[in-house]
């Protein structure tokens, strides 16, 4: 279901001919060869999804889509915006990978997926980033949000201002990790805009999304993006589970990167 591929194929046909007659007068030029018929554009694939979009990163052209502006629950795809802001802070010199962050009770008590950071213990920004991206740890994500903005509520305001700047018109964030909330929503189109901005603005940090595993506190966890193992053309970004199961990935075909965002019809069994 994840491996529907869309590729563009270009080709050129070159025909060259020269003819000289034995007589002094030159033969008239041959009529130009007829241009080959245009390649038909394939129809969009049948995908078991409520909403999806496939966008060419280089041109921002939408290659295929279904209900791409329908409002969806982002779940842990929210962490893409949190990471985007963390990378902003790093690039601007306001944050360093070696900075230490003391884990608050709010971060430590967070629900859902965890990096298993310890209450009151300092953790490096580097390890928190790995915990957020590789393990999808809500605790690591909230710790980073609090380090940048003081509180998670204030950080959500920063998320929404960035969403507005990126023209994510169908998105509103209420927290940094993606825990359910009535006014916490996005669209497949908006997530494709965020994915493209991530790759474009912070290529030096995008490598985090291809790391396969991370160990913290003696607990080793695999990257939750199973496409890294299943498809060698996928170089990163994020799945989201459990409800609704969704993903944002960056497959590369013929040296071309695409942003692929989808929400499944039903949660996995």
Question: Model features per residue range: what roles?
Answer:
Residues 1, 168-172, 180-269:
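Domain-terminus/edge residues, biased toward the C-terminal soluble/receptor-binding domains
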Residues 13, 22-23, 240:
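Non-catalytic interaction/Regulatory regions outside core domains
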Residues 23-189, 196-200:
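Active-site-adjacent loops and short helices of periplasmic peptidoglycan-processing enzymes
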Residues 8-18:
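Bacterial N-terminal signal peptides
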Residues 20, 108, 260-263:
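A residue-identity detector for tryptophan
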Residues 21-22, 269:
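Domain-scale selection of a single, long terminal region
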């Amino acid at each position: 279901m994840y491996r529907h591929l869309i590729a563009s194929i270009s080709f050129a046909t070159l025909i060259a001919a020269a003819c000289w007659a034995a007589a002094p007068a030159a033969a008239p030029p041959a009529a130009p060869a007829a241009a080959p018929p245009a390649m038909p554009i394939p129809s969009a694939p049948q995908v078991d999804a409520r909403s999806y979009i496939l966008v060419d990163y280089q041109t921002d052209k939408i290659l295929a889509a279904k209900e791409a502006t329908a409002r969806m629950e982002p779940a842990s795809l929210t962490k893409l915006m949190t990471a985007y802001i963390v990378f902003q802070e790093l690039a601007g010199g306001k944050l360093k990978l070696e900075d230490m962050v003391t884990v608050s009770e709010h971060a430590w008590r967070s629900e859902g997926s965890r990096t298993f950071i310890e209450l009151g213990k300092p953790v490096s920004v580097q390890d928190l980033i790995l915990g957020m991206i590789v393990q999808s740890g809500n605790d690591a994500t909230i710790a980073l949000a609090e380090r940048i903005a003081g509180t998670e509520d204030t950080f959500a305001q920063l998320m929404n201002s960035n969403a507005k700047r990126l023209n994510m018109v169908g998105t509103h964030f209420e927290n940094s990790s993606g825990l359910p909330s009535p006014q916490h929503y996005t669209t497949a189109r908006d997530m494709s805009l965020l994915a493209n901005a991530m790759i474009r603005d912070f290529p030096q940090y995008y490598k985090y999304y291809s790391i396969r595993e991370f160990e913290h506190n003696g607990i080793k966890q695999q990257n939750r993006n199973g496409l890294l193992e299943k498809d060698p053309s996928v170089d990163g970004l994020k799945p989201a589970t459990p409800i609704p199961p969704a993903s944002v990935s960056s497959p590369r075909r013929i040296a071309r990167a695409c942003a692929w965002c989808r929400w499944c019809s039903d949660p996995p069994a």
